[in-house]
A protein has these predicted regions:
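Alpha-helical solenoid repeat scaffolds of the TPR/TPR-like class and their adjacent stem/linker regions
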Residues: 1-260, 265-337
Length: 337
């Protein structure tokens, strides 16, 4: 029903599933993603938070925080789901810091240095071996924070690159850019993701944008796909940073020096958005719930612009619009100079 854009019928079907199986977590979770897709965020997060029964799922002997006062208390915020999900919801950690006596963030290893180098007012760890359950009054999934806090509003940027890292990449890019607009690119996500076929673009199709003049194309694509960039022609206008992107702290150092990031729905897009960097996100006809429907702006990331497929599976028209917008941006930059 959703793919046929029959939203009223879809809502009725979701509610029917919840009524038939009120204890079925998947039914409540699905209703939550439906409301989030429609932009009904507060309602959506409340239902989305029912995706797991944390008392049963969390393996440490710490009470799960359900909301409410944290005054004088210590709380463990733990990671859940993918890198993009965590980058999205780390925006709410500062609010918890203001509420609690002590905060510890348990995060995936590739994100840890990014947080530590920001010198945050909380502890960062990457393993349960670093934790003692007796130290904490409460625990809460980072991805549950939107459902527990009184407002979804948060300050952006909330992530940034360490100054030393930023300066290292400034020097590297300065040698290559020669006055060109510096644009970072990501065209493919994790191939193991259930929606990857829908969200990723083949490099052969994506590289058509490289015909736009006045741009230094900076490769932020990691994994198997990065080899395609290395094999591309016109080396004078291509800068391959991917081989040095060992973690998100390194990627943040590159992004901090770019004029724009163009990406499909991946963790890099979340990182750029969280840093307040101008980001153009390329979305399939049926996007993930957080990008909502039809709008070109983004509630979560003010500096992000959404380019959506208008025909299912057709990226060519999207890339044409992006190329046109890029040409305008280059011309505007040249006029200013």
């Amino acid at each position: 029903l959703l793919r046929e854009e029959k939203y009223e019928e879809a809502e009725a079907a979701y509610w029917q599933a919840v009524k038939l199986e009120p204890d079925l977590l998947k039914a409540r979770f699905s209703l939550g993603t439906f409301y989030l897709l429609l932009g009904q965020r507060e309602k959506g997060w409340k239902w989305y938070d029912a995706r797991l029964n944390w008392e049963d799922s969390f393996r440490m002997d710490i009470p799960i925080w359900r909301g409410g006062s944290l005054e004088g208390r210590s709380i463990l915020l733990f990671y859940e789901q993918g890198f993009g999900d965590m980058l999205h919801c780390l925006r709410y950690v500062p609010q918890i810091v203001d509420m609690a006596k002590e905060v510890t963030v348990w995060i995936q290893e590739p994100l840890a240095r990014l947080l530590k180098e920001m010198e945050p007012p909380y502890r960062v760890c990457t393993s349960s071996r670093e934790l003692d359950a007796a130290q904490f009054d409460f625990a809460c999934s980072i991805f549950s924070l939107p459902a527990k806090l009184p407002s979804l509003e948060a300050e952006v940027p909330y992530l940034w690159a360490a100054q030393e890292n930023k300066e290292t990449w400034r020097k590297k890019l300065a040698l290559a850019s020669n006055g060109l607009l510096k644009v970072g690119v990501v065209w493919a996500g994790n191939p193991e993701h259930t929606n990857d076929e829908n969200r990723s673009i083949s490099f052969e199709e994506f590289r058509r944008m490289f015909t736009v003049q006045g741009i230094l194309w900076v490769n932020l694509q990691v994994g198997e796909e990065q080899k395609h960039f290395q094999e591309a022609s016109e080396p004078a206008r291509l800068f391959d940073a991917a081989g040095e992107l060992t973690d998100f702290a390194e990627t943040a150092g590159v992004i901090a020096n770019l004029d724009l990031v163009i990406a499909v729905d991946t963790a890099v897009a979340h990182l750029a958005g969280a840093m307040g960097k101008a980001t153009w996100l390329l979305l399939p006809y049926h996007p993930e719930w957080r990008w909502e429907l039809k709008r070109e702006d983004c509630f979560w990331y003010p500096a992000m612009r959404l380019f959506r497929q208008t025909v299912r599976g057709d990226w060519s028209e999207v890339l044409l619009r992006v190329a046109t917008a890029l040409t305008e941006k280059v011309n505007l930059t040249e006029r200013r100079e």
